[in-house]
Amino acid sequence: MNQFSLHLNAQCDCVLILRSMVNVLCKRAKLSQIEKNRVGLAVDEVYANIVRHGYQRQAKPMDFHADMKKDDNGDDLLIFTFRDYAPVVNLSDWDCGEVKPCCAETIVPHGLGIPLIHTIMDQVKHEAFDDGNGWTVIYRSKKKIGEGK
């Protein structure tokens, strides 16, 4: 079975638990070390945004699900879903479209997480609920030439 679920009181140090779940799925999908690090970074960033911005660093409940499925091409889909109970996020004023390149001279703290997540993951979804938010990020592991199914 390639599913993991976790209900936790979200705190900064809990990212280690989420990362271990991500690492198991990445290993099962036979991702390279670079891919594994990138997927882990994107999941860490979603989690950090919930803890920092949604919960203002207060320990509050959150659900996390990690799943791996095959698509119609035989590629692995790594699906990570977060359910928070923070104030509903209004994405209408977010510019999550085209990611603009940056350089060391223009990098400032904050504001790079969302573009980073969109760059790494193949799909990023947000769903507003009456009592919080749902976040889904999906990574597609493309089969390399010569690999079996």
PLM region spans:
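Glycine-rich/acidic phosphate-handling loop/turn and adjacent ATP-lid/helix
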Residues: 73-110
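Bergerat-fold GHKL ATPase/HATPase_c domain
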Residues: 1-41, 148-149
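Solvent-exposed residues in well-ordered beta-strands and their adjoining turns
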Residues: 9, 69, 83-85, 138-142
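Conserved ATP-binding N-box helix of the HATPase_c
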Residues: 33-60
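Short, low-complexity Ser/Thr-rich regulatory SLiMs
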Residues: 68-72, 128
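A conserved short beta-strand within the histidine kinase catalytic ATPase domain
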Residues: 60-69
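Flexible, glycine-/charge-rich segments associated with ATP-binding catalytic modules
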Residues: 1-6, 102-106, 112-149
